[in-house]
Every structure is written in structure tokens, then in C-alpha cells.
Amino acid sequence: MNKQQLAAKIWESANKMRSKIEANEYKDYILGFIFYKFLSETEVTRLHADGMGNEDLEELREDDTETAQYVRDLCGYFISYDNLFSTWVAKKGDFAIANVRDALSAFDRNIDPARKRVFAGIFDTLQTGLSKLGTDEKSRSKAARDLIYLIKDIPMDSRQDYDTLGFIYEYLISNFASNAGKKAGEFYTPSEVSQLMSEIVAWHLAGREEINIYDPTSGSGSLLIHIGQAVARRNGNPNDIRYYAQELKENTYNLTRMNLVMRGILPDNIVARNGDTLKSDWPWFDTDETKDETYEPLFVDAVVSNPPYSQNWEPPEAGEDIRFEYGIAPKSKADYAFLLHDLYHLRDDGIMTIVLPHGVLFRGGEEGTIRRNLVENHHIQAIIGLPANIFFGTGIPTIVMVLRKHRDDDHVLIVDASKYFTKEGKNNKLRASDIKRIVDAVTGNRDVDKFSRLVGIDEIRQNDYNLNIPRYVDSSDNAESWDVYSTMFGGIPKRDIDALSKYWTVFPGLRRCLFAEENGHSAKLAVQDVREAVNADSDVKAYIQRYREAFIDYPAYMRGELVGNAANVSIAAEEETLTNDLLRRLAGIPLVDAYAAYQVLDDSWQKTISIDLETIQAEGHDAVRKVDANMVVKKKGGKDVEVPDGWVGHILPFDLVQGKFLTSDLAEIATFESRLSEIGGEIADILENLDEDDKSSTDAVSEDGDSFVAAELKKAVKSIGKNPETDFDRALVSAQRLFDEEREVKKNVKNLRSALDEKTRTVIEGLSDEHADDLLAAKWVEPLQRKLEELPQTAVDELIAAVNALNDKYSTTYSDVCEQIEQAEAELGNMLDQLTGNEFDMAGIAELKTLLGGE
């Protein structure tokens, strides 16, 4: 399985196994076990690399103080052989929950003092939660054993496996967050929001060699990790990044540390604290005893945070805390307290991004004072309005604010991205194209109609420092207007046609082709079929041809970039390379939305290409020639068990291979399947032509008359014999003959499909390198090319729809409507004349006729 499939399998099983345990609690248990597995296997891997064999591992004991110290120096901790995760797995039925308790207690005793800050107490949440896994030792042991067997297949012993492990960890955190309810989901910042913030930060920090980043409300640590990954992609060496994190809740603080360690971040680059960020600021010192000599305030290159919204806090007196020189946030709303804390800890050339509730933009009182100070001192670089319902557990509108410690620009970029998202389950989600659209606007200080605007400080002053986004950016759809003249007399107003000017610029002759001017005010449609006329236009054809020429060598380029370089391509950096090439091809081609094109590329990259590249780089090019047993879940002994059912390609889908190499086999199957369809139709015809009395007279037809009853039909035909006498008998015999044929055809199809699967398996396993590469190109490049080729036609189709909509809008005039009303009233009046009734009925009818305009 690839990492996506493995993560989904683990989540599905874990969600079933947690039973009545709250998702937020169960999260801590499974993630704790995953982390323990990681530490165990990291120790084993490092000892193997240092020359220790498996037999030597069995001698790892805590009372061997010299070896224990050697391992602590090597790893930062020591785990004895009896307490290794692999030993737990090997115990099988002999494993007990006591093994876990003993191991976790021993771990705390065996941490290298220099690594206490990273590892001390990291399993406390798991340790205290073990009792909730069951009602007694037996049930707890079974629950823990099930968890261990569930996660034992997660790979953790190579650089690629850090990505797999991290992906699974993030996948589980995300799914637990989405199932955890209103408050419990707040520990997690959705990865798309993290990515948005990280791209902005990474852009600002590009080119720096050593970087310190800080999250004062770190939650799961995912936001910090995204920032680090984005910075490392631009700057090269991930080990040049130092991570500072602070988190109030102990279980979430442990989650932060686990997540950072499991991403392969060096322990020396992790500095995490469990504490109240607002109460206990970060004066840095080695120990309490030496704090007077070693005190050093923390200043970093970037601060990122998603603090709890509108949190209660205990504000200090004015002037007591240097962090809050711009003002003291209200006691019931700590949002600006977190912001000012973040800003204080920036270096002079640093940048920060923070998620806040929308209310911070316009609430008054002390918050208004803080906002004024931030604006007047040029700290706010950008305000990004996010879609509603994008965070787990809350649907309130949120923003990302981008601030700098020092900047000369007195403008603020206001971005309204509230309409750019896709729906996913209960929540809204930013797409890759939405993130890129926002990042491009922020990093380029772009004015984009109905999306972003660079606002001067004078305008903000005039609005009394109210930064509410709709004051500056109107993202609403234009209200539909109706032309009075055209409504009365028909015709399409010229101004409505002028509004499509972006199309007429590209297709200069098309307007004259589509419209014939009636007077100086309006025009009428000059063609019967708009689609046919537009697609036949020479300018439109030239436009589509120009687009195709820009992509004529795209398959060859993509094949060279990806297929020919699959073993060495940098998966982390390659998408940006492909994006730059795509945007270069689109430059100068109007109407096509570059962000739509980017989304097509990103979908292909994320869902297919990068996954396959990871597999090839981890397993070698022979992975392309591998097939796997197709595992399906079936009931066995009342339980769901996985059993093999045929084969699937490890990388290459069977249908792709069959479509390229086994077309005659597919054609033969298609012939039989076509016959199956015909048989179904013939049986339906027989049933439809049966007399209702005949249907009700036999058990061979179901009570509702919609189908034959197989067993009863067989009995009836047997009793009819070889010489049916009536049309009804002959119909039953024909139906049985068709059912017999259908059974044989289905059997043939099943056998042919089974044989085809075996042939496909043989073909895949015997592929030459050239054919393997051809199939990779067919899987990766051809679908992408097809979707990109659809984009110019999509732009043309939008014009066709707009022209048809204009024509429909004014095709019926007001006088036409009045005439239709009069006609309907007259028809109704005539029908009323034919009614009879008592004197009261007739009086009512007469009054209705008067209202309708009758006599």
C-alpha cells in the first residue's frame, strides 16, 4: 500500500477500535504508540548502523549501564530489548498492558539529560490513559495489542519513511480533529491554512541560512512543520531551521514534540515548553539556577500561530509587560494579546502570520487602540479573509493577518478570499489554486478586482482604523440590471454586449458575426445556433490552435522531467518547477484561468504522480513491474477479515495496461457484455408483452409483475415440455432460454476476466524498461494533457453561455408578457362561462370574471 492507502486503513480500523472512547482521547493513545514504535525502530536502526547485530540487541538491558549510556549518547534515550516495540509484537498473545506501563516508566528513567527538554514526560498522556482502554487488565491488554498490530506496518527506517510516517500522523490528527467536536478540534490547524501561512513566510525568509521559527500556541505542531518544510524547499538545508514551540495543554504539548521528532527534525533543533504563553513569556535561560547569568529574550525570524479565539485571560496592568506597549486586550478577548506577543518576539527583519477571528478588524475600545497603533507603525502587511467553516469545531469567519516588525510601506493589502474554496464533508477547504491565488496577491502586493486591494493609510484613518474587509474590497456579484428599452421592445442592449469586451478583444470578428445592430441602442442575434457559429469562427479556431501550439511539446517535456528522471527527481521541489513551466506556456494566452490550469496540475501531482514517484524512489524502478494481491474484506467466523481476491498493479492500473497491450481480449469481453445487455432487454420485452391476466395466473412472475421468479420459471417451463401450445407458454420458454444463455455468458465473462487478469499480471511483470516508461507516461502525462487541452474550450463555452443568456433575457418583451396574460385571462374567462352552480357560486364566479377583465 502507498501512504494514502495505509493511512486510510489505519484510520478506519482505529475509528472502529476506539468504541466508546472519545476521538480526542483515543488520538493520544494511538499517536503515542506510533511515536513509541518510531523511537524503538530509530534506536535499532542506529545500533545496526553502528555495527550491532540482532543477537547483540537481545543483550540490551538497563542494568548494563555502559551500553545504556552509549545508547543514550547515540539516540538521546535508551530502550531495553524487552521494551522494544518489535519485542511487544513478537510476544503475540503473551503481550500484556503491564509491558507498556513498565516500558514507559523505564523510558523516563533513561533519557539523556541533554535531551530532557525534548523527551521528558512525552508519554505521560499515554501512560495515564492506559486505564481507559478497557475495564480490566485482560480487555486493556487486548485493546493495546490490537493497536500495536494495527500500526506495526508503518515504515520508519528511511528518509522516505519520514514522509510516510509524517503523512499518516497528520492524516490521523486531521481525522481525529474533524471527529472531535467543537472544543477538541481546536488543537489542529487544517493543513491548507498551514500551507497558506507557510508559503508567505517562506517567501519572506528566502535566502537566509539559519532560521528560527516559533509557534506560541503550537497545538499538534503541524503549523510549525509546514513552515519548516516550505522554508527548507526554498533554502535547501532543513537542519538549519530551529523550532520553538509553546503549548498550554500537556497532552497537546506532547503531541507537538512527537510530531516534530518524527519528521526527522534534530532534537537539538527542537525547543518546546509546556506553559501559558500569555502568563509565562519566553525569557530564555539554561536552568533556573543560572537564569540570572544566562537570561536571553527570544527573538526569531518568523512567528506563526493559531491561538484560541476570543479567549479569557488575566491582563497585566498597563506598562507592566513590554509585550503590550500598544495596548491591553480586553479580559474576555485575548486575540490581540496573542498578536502582540507574537510581534514582540520577531527580529527586526522578521515576519509573522496569525489566525484570528474576523472581529479583531472592527471591534472598538482597547482593541481599536491596538489596531490604530499597529496601522500607524506600519506593522500590518496584509489581511486575508478566509472562507467560513474552514476550521474544525467552529464556523465563525476567520482571517490570517501578516505582520512585520519593521516595514516602510504605509499600505495594507486587504484580501477577500471568502469565496475561494471547495466543500469537503462538513467543512470548507482551500484548494491548491486558492492558496496560490492568495500567496501571489500577498507576495506581489497585487490589486485584483473583487479579490484584493492595496489600501493606503489615509483611507484607513478616514475609516477610523476599522479594517473590516467589505469596506475596502467588494467581492459581491454584480447586481443584475435590466434595460428598460430592451425590456419593452426587445433586442440585446449594446452595453450588455460591450460587457463581454474581454472576448471581443481576443475574437475581433466574432461580435459582428453574432449580432446585427437594430439601432444605436440594441442589437439582435444574427445566428440560429450560437455554439455552432462561435466554434466555426476563424478567430476562435486560431485561438484554440495557438493554445495547442503552446503545449505541443508538453508531453515530451513532462516525460523528460518525470519519467526519465523518476529515480532522482526532487519530489519536494519538482511541482514548483512544473508550475513555472506551465505558467510560462500560458503567458500571453488570454481568457484561460492560470489558476484553473494550476489546479489541474496540482490534482495530478498530489493524487497520482508524487505518490508513484515516492514508491519508485523507495523501491526502485522494478516497482513499476510489481503486482499485489487485491485484498478485500469478507466475513469469516463473524468477523471482518482481509482475504486476497485477484491482483492489482503496484503502480500501473490493470485497465491502463489492458488498454495498451491486451485490446483484443478487452474486445472479446466487450462482445459478451454487449450480449448480456441485449439479453436483459429481450427478457424485459417478453415481460412487458405478457397479458396482465397471464402474469397473475403464474408463480413464474413476481407479484408486482416486474420480474421473473427464477425457480418458479424453471418449474413452469419443465411442466410445459417441448411443445408449448399457447403464446404465454412460448413466452415462458423463451424467457428461460434467455436466462440459460445469460448464465453461460456471465460464466464466460468471468472466466475471460480471470484469464485477462493473469495475462495482465504477466505483461506487467515482463515489461521492458521502455514499455514501463511508456505506461508511466500514459498514467501521468496523458490525462493531464487532456484536461489542460479542455481549458481554452471552457473559456469559449463561457462566452457561448453568456451570449445565450443575454438572448434569453430579452427574447420576451413586456408587451409579450402582457399579451400572454391577456390570453390566459381570456381562456380562463371562457372556462368560467362553462361552470354552473347555485346563486352564491355564480356570484363568486362573476366577481372573478370582473377581476380578470371579463364582463
Task: Put a short name on every predicted segment.
Residues 1-201, 268-277, 385-388, 412-418, ...:
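Non-catalytic, mostly N-terminal accessory regions of nucleic-acid modification and defense proteins
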Residues 137, 158, 217, 245-249, ...:
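Hydrophobic alpha-helical scaffolding
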Residues 398-442:
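Conserved P-loop NTPase
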Residues 299-300, 333-335, 349-351, 377-381, ...:
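Active-site lining segments that contact anionic ligands and/or coordinate catalytic metals
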Residues 183-305, 310-314, 320-327, 337, ...:
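Conserved S-adenosyl-L-methionine
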Residues 314-334, 358-366, 387-392, 425-427, ...:
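Short, contiguous acidic/charged loop-to-helix segments that flank catalytic cores in large enzymes
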Residues 5, 9-10, 16, 22-38, ...:
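Conserved Class I SAM-dependent methyltransferase catalytic core
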